[in-house]
Amino acid sequence: MMKTFMKKILLLLGSAAVFCAGMPFQVLAAEAGSEAAGAVPLALCIPFAGLLLCIAVLPLVKAEWWEKHQIHAVVLWSLLFIVPFAVRYGSGTALETVLECLVGDYLTFIVLLFGLFCVSGNIGMEGDLAGSPRINVGLLMLGTCLSSWIGTTGASMLMVRPVIKMNYWRRRKSHIMIFFIFLISNIGGCLSPIGDPPLLMGFMRGVPFFWSLHLMPVMALNVAVLLFVFYWLDRRAYRKDIAEGCKPDISKPGTEIRILGLHNLIFLVMIVAAVILSGVLPGMVAFQNEAGQVRGIRLYGEVKLSYPALIEIAMILFAAWLSFKTTNSEIRRKNHFTWGAIQEVAVLFIGIFITMQPALMILKAKGAELGITEPYQMFWVTGALSSFLDNTPTYLVFLTTAGSLGFSSGIATTLGQVPVAMLEAISCGAVFMGANTYIGNAPNFMVKSISDENGICMPSFFGYMLWSLIFLVPVFLMDMLVFFL
């Protein structure tokens, strides 16, 4: 199964590379790259919108076809961006743009997901487990607290299977996983640079490591409100399940709750350490050349795989390998572990990363011209764009914009002085509003896929957005009124 999956990924990469290699190099990559960054036509964003529509609509109308042909849809929409882009700016620029997003962003993204998916799949629980409203609130609170210290992806992968297992007997449980995404996969990651990649980028640009603790009041209010709403919803669903005869199987008295594969926490710490190193090593002299640039393996043009990224990838893959070598396969069987979820995410997100490049180029070129000067504006614009685009470059665009506004006080970053309220708004917008869609943050789609695999009927792409519109947007309005006006 994994061999077939790798062949499909290579098909996509090969299609792009062969096309770019076969075209005449109309312009020098460096020159065309600067032109592309400043004048990308809006029409080149159509493939990104088309791919999102496929993800949203096809599982509803052609589920079996979509499951078999996801890779072909990804190849189609990717080429519909790459071909016109190469014709307009030259195949050199097209190849460099695609390689930059794949090597600079997608590779570390998918390796991190893969490592956490493998390690968490080797950690299990057994015993008399029965999900009740109070227990579920406790689980969500625990996962939310973990998110800032092992990352939203790490906490999501660690907690998703125990939460599913405790609620296996429930008939109404999709709301549990939706609030899981709201809290553990997103909002909980705002208190440290480890929590979410945008904050790690902020740390690399001079924001103090523990500055994110300033976001504690905003996070506490959001978590308190959402947990209160969740408890009310879950209590109603729980009572209906009980009334309809749903009961947990606790027929084995004396069975203690046990955590299986506990040694895998060591490998989880290895992965977290790899992420931290990826943010620290680029600032060390040993990893910089004479010009102050991060050293790496040059692949093509200005594209290179940096040594810190290479170390991160090696550490994560080694941790995943150790996890599988040292854990009994029976634990994975009890966890209903399959490769389906990571394969789906890997295929879809390679297309998302490629096709969203024009939108990111336009944002980088025009972001400073939007006239955004107030914290509440930063909060909403950063958040709205982070719901659909990669929240890390979105965060950097608006951090750069804030640093260029000429403030004389605030947090001293390498991009300029940024007022505390402005930085709080940008950080909260990028981290919190990743919860608005399945593609807003890395773990969202993973949680959905694992839930689907385990028989939980998760809402469609637009169905999930309706949930976020009803439950998250009012909370974000409250954030604006209390903290950012």
Give residue spans per PLM region.
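Juxtamembrane and boundary regions of transmembrane helices in multi-pass small-molecule transporters
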Residues: 65, 172, 191-192, 210-259, ...
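N-terminal secretory/membrane targeting signals
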Residues: 1-29
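Membrane-interfacial helix-loop connectors
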Residues: 84-86, 147, 157-172, 176-178, ...
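Transmembrane helical segments that form the transport core of multi-pass membrane transport proteins
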Residues: 270-405
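Core mid-bundle transmembrane helix pairs that form the ion/substrate translocation pathway
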Residues: 212-326, 482
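Transmembrane alpha-helix boundary signature
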Residues: 25-31, 63-64, 82-105, 114-131, ...
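Hydrophobic mid-bilayer segments of alpha-helices in multi-pass membrane transport proteins
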Residues: 43-55, 69-85, 106-115, 260-270, ...
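Interfacial loop-to-helix junctions that mark the boundaries of transmembrane helices
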Residues: 32-44, 65-72, 94-107, 209-218, ...
